[in-house]
Amino acid sequence: MNLAVQDVVKRPLITEKAERAREANRQYAFEVHRDATKIQVKQAVEKLFNVHVLDVRTAIARGKNKRVGRNVGRRPNWKKAYVTLKEGDTIALFEGT
């Protein structure tokens, strides 16, 4: 699927697990478009944040079942990507500056 660069990365994931991965292994977590490939994620992160990406690992997270009263629905499945950066590169968005 042909996606624009700004459509590939949806938002950063700021969780405790993602913070541990960032501090220990220079891995940054993002929610990405469900149809995006690892190559598209790599190109998008490099272009948007001006960094050098070494590795991309992706996983599809299952949507949770949700209830509102008697009605039962389901949130959609979504994809997350852990991106490993070159030594010395950082993304200011995650650093809180």
Swiss-Prot record:
Record flagged with keyword RNA-binding: yes
Disulfide bonds: none
Entry-linked Gene3D superfamilies: 3.30.70.330
InterPro entries documented for this protein: Nucleotide-bd_a/b_plait_sf, Ribosomal_uL23-like, Ribosomal_uL23/eL15/eS24_sf, Ribosomal_uL23_CS
Annotated SUPFAM superfamilies: Ribosomal proteins S24e, L23 and L15e
Any GO CC annotation of this UniProt entry: ribonucleoprotein complex
BP-aspect Gene Ontology terms: translation
Record's keyword annotation contains rRNA-binding: yes
GO MF term list: rRNA binding; structural constituent of ribosome
Superkingdom, taxonomy of origin: Bacteria
UniProt keyword terms in alphabetical order: Ribonucleoprotein, Ribosomal protein, RNA-binding, rRNA-binding
Family: Belongs to the universal ribosomal protein uL23 family.
Function: One of the early assembly proteins it binds 23S rRNA. One of the proteins that surrounds the polypeptide exit tunnel on the outside of the ribosome. Forms the main docking site for trigger factor binding to the ribosome.
HAMAP family (alphabetical): Ribosomal_uL23_B
Subunit note: Part of the 50S ribosomal subunit. Contacts protein L29, and trigger factor when it is bound to the ribosome.
Name of the protein in its database record: Large ribosomal subunit protein uL23
Record organism: Anaeromyxobacter sp. (strain K)
Name of the gene encoding the protein in the UniProt record: rplW
